[in-house]
Amino acid sequence: MTIQILSPQLANQIAAGEVVERPASVIKELVENSLDAGATRVDIEIDKGGSKLIKIQDNGSGIPKSELNLALSRHATSKLSTLDDLDAILSFGFRGEALASISSVSRLTLTSRTAEQTEAWQAYAEGSDMAVKVIPAAHPVGTTIEAVDLFFNTPARRRFLKSDKTEFTHIDEWLKRIALVKPEIHFTLKHNGKQVRNYRPANNQDQYLMRLAQICGKNFAEQAIEIDCQHEGLTLSGYIQSPFFTSPASDTQFFYVNGRLIRDRLVNHAVRQAFSEHGTGELASYVLMLEIAPHQVDVNVHPAKHEVRFHQSRYVHDYILQALQSALMQVARASISLPEEKLVEFVEDDWHSKPLSTGRVSEADPSNYATQSKFDEKPRESGSQGQSSSISAPSSYSRGGEYSARSQPELPSASEIASYTQLLKTPQTAQASKLVNSDLKTPMPPVLAGQYWVYAGDELSLLPIDIVAKWLVKRDILAKIDNGLVSQPLLMPVSIKVDEDWLNTIDEREQLLRQLGIEITIRLGQLIIKKVPPYLRQSQLVTVIPELLQWVRFEEPTHEALALWLAKQDDGKFESAVATWSAFSQLDDEIQQELAQKAKVLPWQSWLEEQLSD
């Protein structure tokens, strides 16, 4: 076949494959256009999950008659005109592909009127027909777009659509996300003629908290801590869960950059690292908005604009991490240091806080960042919360409501120290260890307290055995997961109250669950767990299984990620230090060194010398 230029119709349909994945994608593009046009109200109406009808009406600035035809052309946009504009994007749209792509896979009608026009005009385009018909119409100032029969001319794409309920769920989820970052906009959503969502404009904090409760749940809104931190062109605001929140949920995790919801590993790592000090980690709940100079972030990474790249990624990571750590620690410390009746107002180190009843944490002291230049790539070396520095362990509440300090690893007793010192001074002990393990490929180091291998070199160090054991479990899972893990029936099936979102997730991920060795059914409003792989038998299934379903609901995790997750859930202790060392010593030297670096190595030489000198 000879090389040739694609026809505009075919090019648009190919582009639609990137931009228009499902009805929710169409609504995302059209609503973002409404917001860029300055709309203060956006009404969304869909039929049959959006596959039959998608209708978006706004009160924005509208489109002049002379530009209606051009608006449906590919690479036509009002958002930018020069290369410099691409480096300073603050609008949602800028690629000029959405309307052309949508019109190529649906029957699209665009009706609009500007404030300067006395009448409205309507443009109609259908599928591969590039001709646009423009006729007079009746319409208030603003724009209405109707997309009917989505994918009517691409049957293969239409077959890949899920059930109406599933497609509606994706639309509803996206609307929640945009409603959180655009509180001043009035959003409504109708499905099959019935209004299902009505997010009224929130013009003050109390009204925003009502919207937050409507979307994220009343429990989160009541205990959330408000963040408002500014420094050197960066502003982090929003709400995070209290360190004492007992019901964190991974489905309440929203992060926005310049008003755009994004998925970014760097951001996720910073947030999870901050919350990991309080035991929540990946389950932490938050709604955070980062404002940054547009030339410091590249949003032109993905056609759907879900991803961004920061020009100074390390600086942004450390800024987010330190802001969240300071806020969480401030609340935890205040709960300890002040009597209950004085918890109404307090001032703590770097942060100035408003009354705890509002859960607000306000602007950070700029002196915390004084030693670091703007957008410096190097990790912070000063300040109390830098990535490379250590912080005090935050506090938490026990289930009984009383304060208890975060548990710390127990230090060896005096007798253990004496035994350990004697071990180091007596060569016969090491020789005995070699005799016991003479059948191993490499002699096993001495074992301390049944938990650590003792390495002697320039500096004594302890390698936790359970970390190596977990890695070996992960490797074992990876070797078996392709053919499916073995299921083990539970003696007594576990039942959980079902969430309606799980129905579609279980249906869509049935093969994945079977591959993991998990057998679950839904009966009488209960999720019944019948079989699980051996790695989950000792886990809290009422927590673990919902966590897994929430994870796979929007993602397709790799086998590597699934194996790591299962290994972390395996609460079984390693069989023995000798058996673990035997498996460890069979690995390649390269892998052994990599494991030793990843494991937590504890320097004990100086600590022991101090203890013995006392």
From Swiss-Prot:
Keywords, in A-Z order: DNA damage, DNA repair
MF term (GO), any: ATP hydrolysis activity
GO biological process assignments: mismatch repair
GO CC annotations, alphabetized: mismatch repair complex
Biased composition (Low complexity): 382-401
Region (Disordered): 355-411
SUPFAM superfamilies: ATPase domain of HSP90 chaperone/DNA topoisomerase II/histidine kinase, DNA mismatch repair protein MutL, Ribosomal protein S5 domain 2-like
Transmembrane segment boundaries: none
UniProt KW DNA repair keyword: yes
Domain of life: Bacteria
Family to which this protein belongs: Belongs to the DNA mismatch repair MutL/HexB family.
Function according to Swiss-Prot or TrEMBL: This protein is involved in the repair of mismatches in DNA. It is required for dam-dependent methyl-directed DNA mismatch repair. May act as a 'molecular matchmaker', a protein that promotes the formation of a stable complex between two or more DNA-binding proteins in an ATP-dependent manner without itself being part of a final effector complex.
Stated name of the protein: DNA mismatch repair protein MutL
